């Protein structure tokens, strides 16, 4: 997960300041992996709960810098997602919720073309959860 997070940071054109750090927590009912990276314009955090079926992942890309959310979605393909939900929060408007979206495809690993056509902001702060 450290390599994946480092690659994501490179692909969305952010500057890594520290990390990524990765830790597995083995607590029944809440076991999973947490990854945190400090970037020049804020942070990236990921939590993966492996007890759920299917596994659940939450990824926060929080930045005051511009980036293209579709690049994050493309990188998430590495995990073979079958469902993706996202929230766009605008820091300029005191974190007003500006956009909510969802992509779901029962055929695992296909249908990303429809996601590319979704109404996405050109620059965003992304909370995938």
Model-identified regions with their sequence ranges:
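Polybasic/polar functional segments that serve as interface/processing modules
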Residues: 1-129
């Amino acid at each position: 997960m450290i390599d994946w997070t480092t690659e994501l940071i490179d692909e969305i054109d952010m500057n890594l300041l520290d990390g990524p750090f990765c830790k597995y927590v083995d607590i029944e009912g809440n076991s999973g992996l947490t990854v945190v990276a400090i970037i020049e314009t804020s942070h990236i955090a990921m939590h993966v709960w492996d007890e759920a079926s299917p596994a659940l992942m939450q990824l926060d890309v929080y930045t005051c810098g511009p980036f293209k959310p579709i690049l994050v979605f493309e990188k998430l393909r590495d995990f073979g997602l079958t469902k993706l939900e996202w929230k766009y929060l605008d820091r300029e408007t005191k974190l007003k919720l500006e956009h909510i979206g969802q992509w779901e495809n029962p055929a695992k690993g296909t249908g990303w073309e429809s996601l590319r056509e979704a109404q996405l902001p050109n620059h965003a702060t992304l909370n995938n959860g």
